[in-house]
Amino acid sequence: MKHKKITADVFSSVSKHYDTFLNLITFRRIKDWQRTMLKEVEGAKTLLDVGTGTGEVLLQADPKALRVGIDLSLSMLKVARKKCPNCGFVLADAENMPFKTSSFDAITLSLVYRHLYNRDQFLKEAQRVLKPAGRLAIFDINKFWLTPFLVFFMKFLIKPLGIILFGRDKWEFFIHSLENSLSEEELKRELEPNGFKVIKIQKRLFGIVYIVSAQRI
């Protein structure tokens, strides 16, 4: 619970500047990659975005779908509600979701998976709330030989700006989260024992980020 509270507190405190931060570290490509992730769940009539933050993914999703986002940060959800008034937002834990079994056609996570405290428990919950053959799409940072360069970029090249925007401790939190990234193979090894079949892996920005599409089996 302490880890989750720290995560919620950090994201609550940066909610006003979070979109600026994401544009900064992704060289303004964040929306392109989120749209690529959303293509993997195209046709979903019910969509759940886990760790929805400021609601950017749901804002870009099919407006005809029932769009729901959950997050641990109330401050983030307040921003999201202003952005996407036709979406539903719930203050909830991804490892204990307040939804009935087989509620959603698809689940998305944008730069969230590596922050989860108990990923096995989340995947069990995702299995439960997804309909049979439902889709899970994960966009996140890849752990491979270029990742240290991204850490260096954040630790030194843009650190002064990061500290101005978020403060030293919170900036260190984001750097540490990058160091905890999973490789695509590590992610695959977590998904498959928990009832998901990996369908597709796409890489962007020389492999620094990936979009992994999986199906509930």
Put a short name on every predicted segment.
Residues 95-106:
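A short acidic, Gly/Pro-enriched loop at the edge of an enzyme's catalytic core
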Residues 106-118:
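A short SAM/SAH-binding and catalytic strip from SAM-dependent methyltransferases
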Residues 1-42, 56-57, 79, 170-175:
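Conserved class I S-adenosyl-L-methionine
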Residues 48-96:
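Class I SAM-dependent methyltransferase SAM/SAH-binding core
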Residues 5, 22, 57, 139-190:
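C-terminal alpha-helical "lid/dimerization" subdomain adjacent to the S-adenosyl-L-methionine
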